[in-house]
Curated annotation (Swiss-Prot):
Principal subcellular localisation of the protein: cytoplasm
Function of the protein: Carrier of the growing fatty acid chain in fatty acid biosynthesis.
Organism encoding this protein: Buchnera aphidicola subsp. Cinara cedri (strain Cc)
GO MF term (any one): acyl binding
Taxonomic lineage: Bacteria, Pseudomonadati, Pseudomonadota, Gammaproteobacteria, Enterobacterales
Protein name: Acyl carrier protein
Amino acid sequence: MKNINYRVKKIIAKQFQINIKKISLNNNLKNDLKIDSLDFVELIMLLEEEFNIKLFDIEAEKIKKIKDIIPYIKKKKLKE
């Protein structure tokens, strides 16, 4: 799981030009990282590409923090 956490943080850091050391799994996507709905869609697409999964069933309204995304990725990876 640590590898997944790091990879998610790395993608966010690169895409949104944020120092990875300043990214915590507890960061609120909207309030802390200023990620809007368009950015969120882009983030999901990048995660799908990185992990070679589809996150079409992700419940966007339930995703508030970075750590909320991790279970979706883990669930999809376990199905492989």
